Design a protein with these regions (language model features):
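Glyoxalase I/VOC metalloenzyme domain signal
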Residues: 1, 5-74, 81-165, 172-176
């Protein structure tokens, strides 16, 4: 087992300022395995958690809690051997999706304390190297009539601001 965990495997892909973690359960009989296998059975492969880098994890988390956010994981800090640390906390959003706040404090590592960067694949030297600065949007699927309440949740809990709105006159799919 490359990670030492018999519960899960996570591969981290990083390009520019974008980091994506691909996690799968290895043991379906653990609480992690049961939770994630149920998510996969219900949704197929997909996003379970969206993480945001924040300047002050405690403050961001406490504000969201004070506004009614449902807590999934309380504040937790992990330190590395070089004196840096990473603080995280997770809240529930819509459906089965969660949001994790991540604050890096003098942490210089590749991903999180304890993770070791693997050698780059030699194929990377043979192909064009894109560089991602950010993810400009994500899509969440909602039942008809549920999107407005989700937008309002993000505005209330996280101070998100609507900069573009769409409705059925703009989006047309066969599933409407």
């Amino acid at each position: 087992l490359e990670t030492g965990s018999r519960e899960r495997v996570t591969h981290v892909v990083k390009n520019g300022k974008v980091t994506i973690c691909l996690t799968s359960p290895l043991n379906w009989k653990t609480s992690f395995g049961e939770e994630h296998s149920a998510h996969i059975a219900k949704h197929g492969d997909g996003v379970k958690d969206v993480a945001f880098a924040v300047e002050n994890c405690k403050k961001t988390f406490e504000v969201a809690k004070s506004r009614g956010a449902e807590v999934v994981k309380e504040l937790s800090t992990v330190e590395d051997k070089d004196g840096g640390s990473v603080t995280t906390a997770t809240i529930k959003t819509y459906g089965d999706t969660t949001i994790t706040f991540i604050e890096r404090n003098n942490f210089k590592g590749f991903f999180m304390p304890g993770y070791i960067k693997k050698k780059e694949d030699p194929i990377c030297n043979l192909i064009a190297q894109p560089s991602f600065g950010f993810i400009d949007h994500i899509v969440g699927n909602h039942a008809v009539g549920d999107m407005e309440s989700t937008v309002q949740w993000f505005e209330k809990m996280l101070d998100f601001h609507r900069f573009w709105s769409i409705d059925d006159s703009i989006i047309h799919t066969e599933y409407r």
